[in-house]
UniProtKB/Swiss-Prot annotation:
Keywords: Amino-acid biosynthesis, Cytoplasm, Isomerase, Methionine biosynthesis, Nucleus. Catalyzes the interconversion of methylthioribose-1-phosphate (MTR-1-P) into methylthioribulose-1-phosphate (MTRu-1-P). The keyword Isomerase applies. This is Methylthioribose-1-phosphate isomerase. The record marks C172 as: Transition state stabilizer. The active site is at D252.
Length: 362
């Protein structure tokens, strides 16, 4: 059974504190927007889909008991606080897209004279709550599409009708802890396992925050999947000797040309995969694709505190006084990406903008 990172019922929200994993499993109450901003910014919840869901649900929890004198005041509350939540971690686009969609809904309901202020509030609550179910459904579709693409690639490359079990590599954490459930890149791994086609999964430690060692390894052990943890610096050696069939990672933001911002270290894995002829896939829902930016050059890269590099917990591991550069993300050029796995199919980076535009017009 997948782990549950988000617990929600109307008026109540709790998140699994990911800073304490894998040693302690503790849920934190999120009582409103300030709590939501803090748990996102401090990375007690992380993963682009989960950030958006927790951010929006934190507002739903806050406005649930409130009474509003007018639709205008409710709209102002929604718009102001959603924009504030976007600032918690700006690289991940899902929160921004979700905020824009909910603000658009609020504006439309404000203009509709047939809708009362209470009806407007209920519509908003239902819209935020629907994000949970949709994310899980989207993740399952991503998992199925990604597994199919990897197995088809292996079958074609080896000249067989049906591929046998495969070995894959993943980076950072893209599973139930990063989403509403099931996961994106880790959803692909789960689907391979469900099909009986997963021989082994390798996960990187993902320095400096160790999401792979702390979170992905935790999920894989929890589900008893055949898995091995490797250091970030071992990837080239791994791809050379372990017959890895594919690399599959998540995304915090995908530009219109397919350039992808993901956890720091993703870019170098893509370079190494290209050298070894290993297909490199990005698994991301449509909410992680930002057609408004033409390339990765326009993606804002969050820089995290030095302490995340110099300390593990309370223990210093770097020399006092050393300067640090700690970007949380890097951008993998589209030229290194084999395919972008979405809930609607797998797209070549060069075809992404056209295909996604078609889907959005439906």
């Amino acid at each position: 059974m997948s782990l549950q990172s988000i617990k929600y019922q109307r008026g109540s929200l709790e998140i699994l504190d990911q800073l304490l994993l894998p040693v302690v499993s503790k849920y934190l109450p999120v009582r409103g927007v300030e709590d939501g901003w803090k748990v996102i910014n401090k990375m007690q919840v992380r993963g682009a889909p989960a950030i958006a869901i927790v951010g929006c649900l934190s507002l739903a929890v806050e406005i649930y008991p409130e009474e509003f004198s007018s639709k205008k005041s409710l709209r102002q509350e929604i718009e102001g606080k959603l924009n504030y939540l976007v600032s918690a971690r700006p690289t991940a686009v899902n929160m921004k897209i979700s905020a824009d969609e909910l603000i658009t809904l609020a504006n439309e309901l404000t203009k509709d004279d047939a809708i009362t202020v209470e009806e407007m509030k209920q519509r908003f609550l239902k819209a935020t709550e629907a994000m949970l179910e949709k994310d899980i459904a989207d993740n399952r579709a991503i998992g199925a599409n990604g597994a199919k693409a990897i197995l088809e690639h292996v079958a074609e490359a080896t000249g067989v009708a049906t591929a046998g079990p495969v070995r894959v590599l993943t980076h950072c954490n893209t599973g139930s802890l990063a989403t509403a459930g099931y996961g994106t890149a880790l959803g692909v791994v789960r689907n391979l396992s469900e099909l009986g086609k997963l021989e082994h999964v390798y996960c990187t430690e993902t320095r400096p925050y160790n999401q792979g060692a702390r979170l992905t390894a935790y999920e894989l052990v929890h589900e008893k999947l055949p898995a091995t943890l490797v250091l970030d610096s071992m990837v080239a050696a791994l791809l050379r000797v372990k017959n890895v069939a594919a690399v599959v990672v998540g995304a915090d933001r995908v530009a219109a040309n397919g350039d992808t911002a993901n956890k720091i270290g993703t870019y170098q894995i893509a370079v190494v995969a290209k050298h070894h002829g290993v297909p490199f896939y990005v698994a991301a829902p449509l909410t992680s694709i930002d057609l408004e930016i033409p390339s990765g050059d326009h993606i804002i890269i969050e820089v995290r505190p030095d302490r995340e590099m110099t300390h593990v917990g309370e223990h210093r591991i770097a020399a006092p006084g050393i300067n640090c550069w700690n970007p949380a993300f890097d951008v993998t050029p589209a030229s290194l990406i084999t395919g972008i796995i979405t809930e609607h199919g797998v797209f070549k980076p060069e075809a992404l903008k056209v295909e996604i535009t078609k889907l959005l017009e439906l």
